[in-house]
């Protein structure tokens, strides 16, 4: 892995390792969170049992991650569906402002991205550390299918991150030239819609 790729992944990797040095499967009050573990693993049987026993679907770990975020990050679509049906907050944010949609997009889980958008996730939410959106994540990582899904759901290609770069700028900078034309076409389409 080269240095620029590592720098791109650093915010997510830091969150995955742990945001404060503690076990991220432990809730803020120190209690074990089996629902988060089941969601992370995509263990549908355990997930159904825990939700059926009244486990709150938006329990948080020490990094403010929810079960929905863990399921989305790992591409567990059926777990995402179960959590949403149980009332999980689709746009819950972690300590950095990341949402389940961003985490799914960063790992190219296009079907999970589709599910979250259909459930009402905000396509253009910007996280608080770099100002990245799900579309910027998909463009930076070269995730064509996820990028196309986001564009279909009208994600705004003109949004800029805190450094002033758009998704097309990131695609170009990270060597994903095939995505630049898609983003530019979406950009011209959104410009015409806004007239």
What residue ranges belong to the model's regions?
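Ankyrin-repeat inter-repeat connecting loop/turn
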Residues: 57, 90, 123-124, 157
């Amino acid at each position: 892995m080269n240095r620029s790729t590592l720098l791109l992944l650093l915010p997510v990797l830091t969150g995955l390792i742990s945001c404060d040095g503690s076990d991220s499967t432990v809730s803020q009050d120190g209690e074990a969170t089996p629902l988060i573990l089941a969601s992370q693993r995509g263990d549908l049987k355990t997930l159904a049992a825990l939700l059926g026993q009244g486990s709150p679907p938006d329990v948080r770990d020490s990094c403010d991650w929810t079960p929905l975020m863990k399921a989305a990050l790992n591409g567990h679509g059926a777990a995402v569906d179960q959590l949403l049906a149980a009332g999980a907050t689709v746009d819950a944010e972690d300590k950095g402002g990341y949402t389940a949609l961003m985490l799914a997009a960063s790992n190219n889980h296009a079907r999970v991205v589709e599910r979250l958008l259909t459930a009402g996730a905000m396509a253009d939410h910007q996280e608080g550390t770099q100002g990245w959106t799900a579309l910027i994540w998909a463009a930076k990582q070269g995730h064509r299918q996820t990028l196309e899904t986001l564009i279909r759901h009208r994600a705004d290609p003109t949004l800029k991150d805190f450094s002033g770069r758009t998704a097309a700028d990131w695609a170009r900078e990270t060597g994903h030239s095939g995505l630049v034309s898609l983003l530019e076409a979406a950009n011209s389409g959104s410009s015409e819609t806004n007239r």
